[in-house]
Amino acid sequence: MGEIMYQRILVAVDGSETSLLALDHAVGLAKAFGSELTLLSVIDQLKLPFSAEYGLGARESHEDLMRNVIEDLNEVTMNLRETHPGLSFDARVEEGRPAKIIVEVAEVFDLIVIGSQGFGLIAGWFLGSVSNEVVNSCTKPLLIVKKPGDQKPDPSP
């Protein structure tokens, strides 16, 4: 029974408020269980800027996006090192559809922590579309973190 419940925790980080809340929860769990923590940022290929809109070629746009994601993740990891010395964690960046990449990477983890934007019924049944797709595709235990105050509307009149 002395086995760590969650030896490896994966947290998806995209810089949004809910992903940073998810990171806070993941850090708390990693500290409580003595777990290894991995931060994952996914470059969504569908969000690559169109060259005509920005006056950049596709290659420059991709490189700029990649650089921005890496800089944001580096800032998060530097903050973690300062605020949680001794915390065992690593960070990685992948490219693709965020939900698909999260589910693929999740296979070697014991718990997945992800923030949900909570866009409402149409966008994702009260979860954001990425978290909704992860919930429906992932076979690993999940912790979905929502912003305080995000809740289903009361269906009563």
Report the location of each language-model feature:
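General small-molecule cofactor/ligand-binding pocket signal
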Residues: T38-L40, D90-E94, L143
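Gly/Ser-rich helix-loop-strand patches that form or flank binding pockets
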Residues: F109-P153
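Acidic, proline/glycine-rich short linear motifs
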Residues: V42-E71, Q151-P157
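Conserved N-terminal glycine/acidic-rich loop preference
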Residues: L39, M66-L73, F109-L111, G115-G118
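Structural beta-alpha unit
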Residues: M1-M5, M78-I112, G149-P157
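Short, solvent-exposed amphipathic alpha-helices that sit
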Residues: H25, D64-V76, I101
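Small/aliphatic-rich secondary-structure junction motif
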Residues: G2-L56, S137
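Short, well-ordered secondary-structure micro-motifs
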Residues: A22, P49-A52, I101-E104, W125, ...
